[in-house]
Amino acid sequence: MNHGDHVRLIRDGVLGLTGGEWADLGSGTGAFTLALADLLGPGGSIVSVDRDGDALASQARLLTARFPSASVRCLRADLMDELAIGPMDGIVMANALHFICERELFLTRLTSWIRPGGRFILVEYDSDRGNPWVPHALSWDTWHATAERAGFGETRLIGRVPSRFLGSIYASLSVTSVGPS
């Protein structure tokens, strides 16, 4: 996939928002951080979180070259640690949730990092069959069932692309519950 593919995959999850405070969890070299910076524009701010310092450094160079007005803070951390972020307007997590074996604990933390009514964009392989590179696979059907238990009030599919690994990749948008009305 290229930058245009990344933007198209998450665009519907960001539509209607300009600016705001977002995070990209498990951001790696920043493919979706760049897409988020492109979609949010200069009014947005992004916290890019990954445990690989070299990947974050590479990402910072790309962001400076392609989106010099983007406000991005790189945070080197393990996603299972308490993160000094939030509450955010939205979080993107692309091809990273499948590395987390304690998914329920993590999702409880994740929902606390998002404002009520905030957005969570998940990009994952559409498979429940893992392998060494995708150890805890999470298909769209499994995520859809898991999202409500995790505290999201609404979850919908926003994109899908073919993948040479595990068939396809999906993007979904989940909105955090806003509490009783």
Name each region found by the language model.
Residues M1-E21, A35:
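Conserved alpha-helix/loop element of class I SAM-dependent methyltransferases that forms part
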Residues G20, M80-I91:
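A short acidic, Gly/Pro-enriched loop at the edge of an enzyme's catalytic core
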Residues A23, T29-D81:
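Class I SAM-dependent methyltransferase SAM/SAH-binding core
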Residues E104-P116:
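A short glycine-rich, Lys/Arg-flanked "PGG" loop and its adjoining helix->strand segment in the class I
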Residues G117-Y125:
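Conserved beta-strand signature within the Rossmann-like core of class I S-adenosyl-L-methionine
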